[in-house]
Swiss-Prot record:
GO terms for biological process: cell population proliferation; intracellular signal transduction; intracellular transport; nervous system development. The gene is SDCBP2. One of its GO terms (cellular component) is extracellular exosome. Monomer and homodimer. Interacts with SDCBP. Interacts with TM4SF1. This is Syntenin-2. Preferentially expressed in cells of the digestive tract. Low expression in skeletal muscle and kidney. Detected in differentiated keratinocytes of normal and malignant epithelium. In healthy skin, expression is localized in suprabasal epidermal layers. Changing K197A: Abolishes phosphatidylinositol 4,5-bisphosphate binding and targeting to plasma membrane, speckles and nucleoli. Reduces phosphatidylinositol 4,5-bisphosphate binding and does not change subcellular localization. Binds phosphatidylinositol 4,5-bisphosphate (PIP2) via its two PDZ domains. These domains target SDCBP2 to the plasma membranes and nucleoli, two PIP2-rich regions. It comes from Homo sapiens. Residues 108-187, 192-267 form the PDZ domain. It is found in: Cytoplasm; Nucleus, Nucleolus; Nucleus, Nucleoplasm; Cell membrane. Keywords: Cell membrane, Cytoplasm, Lipid-binding, Membrane, Nucleus, Repeat. SUPFAM superfamilies: PDZ domain-like (SSF50156).
Amino acid sequence: MSSLYPSLEDLKVDQAIQAQVRASPKMPALPVQATAISPPPVLYPNLAELENYMGLSLSSQEVQESLLQIPEGDSTAVSGPGPGQMVAPVTGYSLGVRRAEIKPGVREIHLCKDERGKTGLRLRKVDQGLFVQLVQANTPASLVGLRFGDQLLQIDGRDCAGWSSHKAHQVVKKASGDKIVVVVRDRPFQRTVTMHKDSMGHVGFVIKKGKIVSLVKGSSAARNGLLTNHYVCEVDGQNVIGLKDKKIMEILATAGNVVTLTIIPSVIYEHMVKKLPPVLLHHTMDHSIPDA
């Protein structure tokens, strides 16, 4: 099975590293001698030769810390990642990647109501499915980790397929305030794109009212398949829907060298937020940074 990578930069750097590993002459085994203890060797040799590869500064502390090391005294070969595991020599252990992850499969959550009898959730019907349109900040819906674009499959054991938004809200309204069992699929219309900032701190795209309108040729955004006519839903897992472009760019600027965007096709986004007052998106939507 082919290896998986969070970004094109990770794939290319790993290929270059593996080529160096294969080209390195194998040293013959030597008798064990009492020598001074040396620091554990890095698995990937000659990293300095890859400095500034694809516009990346590979000698940075972040990258050095993410590289796999051979345990001291271990003379056995180091095996590669297992099937389905990510290989990330550049991205490393990125919190943004983890926060933005769209998990496959379905999960069950237990929702409740606040002292006003509210869940903080607004739902919308799309293609016979029921989706999260709005999660209000500091509400039961935000506390259980529901996000914009999540699909609700069941509410208290009842299938939601074909329900109108009105029916769904009525079912939630009549449900118990202590426990509402909801089966959810993570954001099926959305996908994530992981990119790396260049020496100027840019990843290479332009937004207008939250929508990606152009890409910079040769940038990390272009290399990694970021698409125009898509809206930015999250930056490193933090919801940015409804925020001004200036605020979104500020969040991007303060992010690390690795940035993961969650995007959604404009036709789906515009249908989902239709008839939703912009003030709710800007001031009411949960824009907090989620737990990893």
